Design a protein with these regions (language model features):
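Conserved catalytic core of the tyrosine transesterase superfamily
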Residues: 1-236
Length: 236
């Protein structure tokens, strides 16, 4: 709406000089909640498109796609992801966890891992073990997402952002790791998770921070509602 209104304002401003009346002169542009706009920047469909388009033809590309899976299925902050080592990838009975040691609260957190992410992590670990002739124990002290296995230095924030930005270019969007965190939170809200569940999943200390995802859900639901056809029944 704002785009159309802006175009009309520009058009009529030029026509005013010819004595024509400007019908949109005093109409103000709608205020846009930039926070909500940022939250809705990346959808689960966008993630699927990136996965389908991303060509895995090297060790780094294998690492990068595993990063995307991890960001989406855990909602991790960048710092939490970059400090992960293979020793933090744990199995208890039939369940897998990440031990997060660099959380915003300063406390260790055990985060359950979705089965789809477990599959991707297992594939990635086996790939590295095969490529470098290592066993599981050899990888324990290695960063999961390093510059290279031999160097064993964690990726920098700048490198992580560049990786996600390059992926975003595949779908014509300028995105960041935090946009992926927004995407999973919004998806959880749309799937029926309540505000406390989303707060705990994301590691928020206050539900006020989480409320933006509930508001985002309302906007998406309204958009869906607007697509419903009208049903006009004749009154008897």
């Amino acid at each position: 709406v704002n785009t159309i209104l802006s175009a009309l304002k520009s058009l009529y401003k030029e026509l005013e000089s010819n004595g024509l009346k400007n019908p949109v002169k005093y109409i103000k542009l709608f205020k846009v909640n930039r926070n909500i706009e940022n939250v809705l920047k990346v959808s689960i469909d966008d993630i699927r498109k990136i996965i389908g388009l991303y060509k895995i033809d090297s060790e780094k590309k294998y690492r990068n796609i595993t990063i995307l899976y991890t960001l989406f299925y855990t909602g991790m902050r960048s710092k939490e992801l970059l400090t992960l080592q293979f020793k933090h990838y744990l199995k208890r009975e039939d369940e897998y966890f990440f031990k997060l040691v660099e959380t915003k609260s300063g406390k260790d957190v055990y985060k359950p891992i979705h089965k789809s992410l477990v599959k991707k992590l297992e594939e990635y670990r086996k790939y590295l073990m095969s490529m470098y002739s290592l066993d599981i124990k050899d990888l324990d002290e290695h960063y999961i997402f390093s510059t290279s296995v031999l160097d064993n230095s964690p990726l920098s924030y700048r490198s992580l952002n560049a990786i996600i930005q390059d992926m975003g270019k595949l779908i014509g969007k300028d995105i960041s790791p935090h946009n992926i965190r927004h995407a999973i939170a919004t998806e959880l809200s749309l799937s029926g998770a309540d505000i406390l569940e989303i707060r705990d999943f994301l590691g928020h200390s206050d539900t006020k921070v989480t409320e933006v995802y509930i508001n985002a859900r309302s906007i998406l639901e309204k958009k869906v509602l607007e697509k419903l056809p009208e049903i006009n029944l004749d009154e008897e």
